[in-house]
Amino acid sequence: ALTKQYGNYASYCMLACGNEPSGRWVPWVSKFVDYWKATDPRHVYTGASVGNSWQWQPHNQYHVKAGARGLSWTGAQPESTSDYRNRIDTVKQPYVSHETGQWCAFPNFNEIRKYTGVNKANNFEIFRDILNDNHMGGMGHDFMMASGKLQAICYKHEIEKTLRTPDYAGFQLLALNDYSGQGTAL
């Protein structure tokens, strides 16, 4: 039904069977990729989006993996000339970075009242209480603004580094939405 309804849409060019599977998933996703390659060759297929420690999927037409991303600022000063080529140059298929970024920003405590019911921002309340307990309750807004600026700088650096990398097929960002309560991965 998916391919009949949407198969010719310009935005439907890639398909993965899932995200971060567990168990004995490589044989199953290999069959998934082989099935779809034979059934509908208009698109390219991968088994799943995975972290760096997950196995490589040998039947993929492209890989979505977390390995070639991140900042190197712990071992060197920030710069704007490096790329990730040495982390993808041995991969034969196109490489897409899985969940690029995930740079956290301090929460906006003024939003706590907006989250109710199952979406109640208990984690925000905990962070606010920790600040209050340490006599820094009035600094929440400053922390939010400073961490938000750092978050923007980190995303900019990482995305630009990805775009500078020859043959890098792209990147995925995690949870671009208005609700900032995905656990504490804000």
What residue ranges belong to the model's regions?
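Substrate-binding/catalytic cleft of secreted carbohydrate-active enzymes
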Residues: 1-170, 174-177
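Extended hydrophobic/aromatic segments used for targeting, binding, or gating
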Residues: 180-186
